[in-house]
């Protein structure tokens, strides 16, 4: 039996992971009550009792959670952006280069970003085969569903009084989007 703890199980990502794993008979979910979800001691105990710990947390909280893991056998899978380019974390995109071997042998895995994944799947093979220069000027356009904004955005869309959400809203146009470092690093692109 594999014991799994989802730190951040009440958020959009955590709820989806819990839902999928709950149907597995070979997995036992370690859960914390509502009162203990943010209790550091309870979280630390759950993290270190788990065979696999999913971090479904904001970046700062994910970094804090990794610091709580003392059990060398606990596999940590972080869904935040905090560790996607961290050298001690394998980037969880097995179709790219030697990443499959790194994922299999690692106890620290960074889950790829959804928007970054589309870009990486298209660009990394082109860079790897020298069909696209590492310093090429690229743009990326993607659209997310409302669940991509998490619980806050879902609540805004489902509220009785809705804002003007008839068309997509622009986001991340400043050239420093949070997924940019992983897109550049995994694809082997030059930082501009």
Listing of model-derived features with the role each one plays in the protein:
Residues 172-192:
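Oxyanion-binding "anion nests"
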